[in-house]
Amino acid sequence: MAVRWYCWQQEALIIQIRLQPRAKGDEVIGPHGDRLKIRITAPPVEGKANTHLLRFLAKTFQVSRNQVYLLSGATSRDKRVRIEKPTKLLPGITPPIRKTVR
């Protein structure tokens, strides 16, 4: 069974991230084991990398910044992030299954 670096909770996307700060550019590298590897330019100092990551994810998933939350990993490279109702999905992410009510 394939290890998944994301899951859905209703319409919210939960992503397990492996962050590489102080990179040359901001980019999503792709799956890295059970995490999604992301590189950002911000340094891991005084929360700058976390703030930059959340802004980058908001832009990538086409949501407002207040729809992106850091759930865990404030001082670690391994993070869990929640994105509320993402408008755009990355390749490899399947949309949530919507249950119909009869």
Curated annotation (Swiss-Prot):
InterPro entries from the UniProt entry: DUF167, YggU-like_sf
A Pfam family: DUF167
SMART domains given in the database record: DUF167 (SM01152)
Highest taxon in the source lineage: Bacteria
Cellular component per GO, a single term: cytoplasm
Family of the protein in this entry: Belongs to the UPF0235 family.
UniProt xrefs under HAMAP family: UPF0235 (MF_00634)
Protein name (record): UPF0235 protein Noc_3000
Organism: Nitrosococcus oceani (strain ATCC 19707 / BCRC 17464 / JCM 30415 / NCIMB 11848 / C-107)
